[in-house]
Amino acid sequence: MNPNLAILLGLLPAVMLAGGALVCAALALVRPGTRTSLYRWITLLSTVAAFVASMLELTAMTHDATGVGAVDYQGGLIIDRFHVFGTVLVCGVVALTVLGAQAYLRRAAGRAGAFCALLLLSAAASSMLLAQREMAAFTVDFALLIACLVLLTAMTKTSGVTAEAAFRQVLSGGVALATAVYGLVLVYAATGTTDLSRLATGLRVDGTRVDPVLAVVGIGLVIVGLLIVVGAPPLQAWTRHIQEAAPGPIAGFSSALGVVTGVAVLSRYGVEGFGAGSSRWTVLVDVLAAVAMLSGGVLAIRASTIRRLIADLSIVQAGFLLLAAGATAKTISGQAAAGPTALLYALMAAATSLVAALLLAGIFDAAGLGTGLEAYRGAGRRSPTTAGFLALALLALAGLPPLAGFIARLLIAETALDAGAGWAVAAAAVATTLSGVALFRWLSVMYAEDENESPFAVTTTPLVSRVTAWTAAVLGLLLAAFAGPLLSIAGGGATALH
């Protein structure tokens, strides 16, 4: 591929998204009373433009069997199928969010421009994070992503809970960024370069051996820093605050974008930087995955509100994604690891289930229904359509059959077993059982008889937003029905990481 063309195509999706953000911000400043529908259209058009740019990037790599078009700026910009896959998934999350946020934008019309600008800017940061393995580029993009997600939560000024959540996000986000950057400093000291791929060679730029202690500690700190957007222990409080306090569209977007970006970046760094299958990082990731799955399952059993249930199930889900990210070693039979392929398919299922569950929970919030377990008693009979789709989204989030989340977890368990992490698979089985018990506790209440039911109407949320939320929930079924072709697409996206 022509180097100049490669750079242009690699930057184009992020430029389209950032350009849309700039237009929304400028319009909000120049014409404060602009209709919210115009901001939605700008956001959707920018997202479509980024998608088209990604397809152009993919077309330019048609003849590259490795799936890698070019690597420029010492790993600061990577044009490959993995970047294309991640960017398209991010665009899908943005589209679902802006279509599902109509009710929120009506209530906060004065902040619609800022909302859409932050959506697009955070998506641009995510796209750039997926296209690099260089320390300076990572620091700038990661800081921008954290800042945008914090501001999205802080925009909801009508609730003291969201203000507190935003403040806590600032604190935890600062800690995570500092942790990751300090880890990168140690890696730089060990390798003598900002290109993380040098770690995999085991040699510094001057030809001497990499200091193993600095490398291992640095890798560990980078991984821990990334966990803030993934939503896994020890930094799961970041996403829990968003999921419990923020409006449904913001909570769904931040959770889905964070998990897609964080796990995908970790997967790229692990394979291309830390060394595929290297125990320097896979052991830590497997341990963190087991802790996330078990702690999330236990917390889900005790969940007293619908938002906490979603947050706890998402912790379990984050653990499964980490398990897939760590399954990069060759199998016992010597074949290439299938972990990256399983991971990309699982990210599709994870993103759609998170967006769907939180959009649907937001619809019930807007209808005046409480968030507690008893408030949902009989909701399945009072609002059968929306409650049914919420149940579908929760089943997908919990990884139960016959939805895509279940298929993804089976694939992840298989790849983890092949990579020699059978003990982590055992923890995954326990966590899935706990998640199922917690979910069926809620579903039994949702479809129970209750003579003292308080009335509510989901029609307070516009039809477009409700249909979007229902569609996101149905995607769990569609991803399962077309698992074969989608796994082939995921395999193509993972080519660069094998």
Predicted regions span which residues?
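Alpha-helical transmembrane segments of multi-pass membrane proteins predominantly involved
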Residues: 1-498
